[in-house]
Each structure stands twice: as C-alpha cells, then as structure tokens.
C-alpha cells in the first residue's frame, strides 16, 4: 500500500479494503468509516497553513472542532460575512464556528461545544467534552442489530478517553440520558428525523425516486 500511496484515490485504484484492514488503519479507534457512532468513522487530523496570517508555527491545538467549521474559518480569515441570500434564496445560518480563535490562543475554551452524528442508524452526540453513541449496525452488516428504539447507548469522557474505551453509561446514567435527549433535539433541528437505517436499499435508484 505504501508503495502505491500516491495512486490511492486515483483512476487506477479501488480504495476499499477488507474489514480487518479498515479497523487497523483507524487505530487507535475501534470502528471504521461509515460509523458515525465512533471517532474511527468521523475523526481526522487537520493542518492549517497560512504563513501571512498565523504567528503560531508547528503547534498543536486540542479544541474540539468539526468539518462544518471550515467555512466559518475561511470567511473570518477573508473578512467576508456569511451570505444572507444567494440568487434570491435566503440562506440558512452556518452551523460551524471559526477556528481562528484556537490558532491565536492554544488555551482558549473551545467554541464548538455540540455536534450530532448519524449514518445508517448509527448515532453519536458530542457535547462539552462528553460523547454518547449507539452502534446500530456494523458497515459489513446489511441488517440492523436491533430496532432503533432498542439500541444500547454508551457514554465516554472525551478529554480523558481519546480512543473511546471506557464506557461510563452504567456509572453516569443521568449524563447519558441528557445526551440522548440532546441528540434528538439536534436531529430534529437538522432534519435527521425520521432516521433511515436502511443500507443496500438506499443505493437502489427506484427506491429513491430517481432514474
């Protein structure tokens, strides 16, 4: 794989791998892509480079952020306000927040404090250092493990447990219930409901109303 790294993702590659290798390449996390309920499916490193704009060089930031923060960051750097209307169509407010504050101050309190995740019924919610999630199905499983309402939720303290290993659901049921309720609030606000947990059926154009 390393010998062909530059070809990965190009027209001569088929960038899929067996489940075992998928898990291995997502270390130190336990799950893979498609798993919205695990950082192995959602978490990636990010490099920010702006020689004319950043005094910090080669430093690490640990504030929690999401890909939806990129647009807000670019707009702030360019000193451009978000568009309120495009071609007469009113625009929704940006979900994300700019990350420039973290570049300027490594000790600044994080500003992206809540983020939901959902894919194929796998769900997760990050909130102020906590992460709750439920595994509805593995990527290689074509049927759910149980009904959505019967899924088992887990709870993790992200700033103390980077790899999501120590499930605190049993010792902190109040916090877990709080995050489960918050997930439903965020899901409703972002048009996630009703949750569609189908897999193979969703790639059938006839089911999606398109040719």
What name fits each language-model region?
Residues 2-3, 7, 35:
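Catalytic cores of eukaryotic secretory-pathway lumenal/extracellular enzymes that build
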Residues 42-50:
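Active-site-adjacent bridging/hinge elements
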